Amino acid sequence: MERKLYLELCQRHATKGGVLVEYDGVAYQPYAYELKFQPDGKIKHTAILKEPKANCLVYCRLEDVKEK
C-alpha cells in the first residue's frame, strides 16, 4: 500500500472509526505509521495495525497491507 493512502486511512479511522485494512488475510484497524532507517541507509516503512478484538498491535511492512 502507498504511504499517502495508509496515512489517510489512519486519519479517517481516528476521526470517524470503522476503517479496516487487511494484512495476512486478517482485518485490522490502521493505527499508526513508523519510518526507520536501516544500517545500510535504506528506509523501512512500517504499518502499525490494531487488532480490534484482542486489542493488540501488529507491526508489519507497509507494502504487505491491503485496503479492505
Report each predicted region and the residues it spans.
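Acidic, low-complexity, intrinsically disordered interaction modules
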Residues: H13-V65
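Mixed-charge, Lys/Arg-enriched low-complexity segments
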Residues: R3-Y6, E63-K68
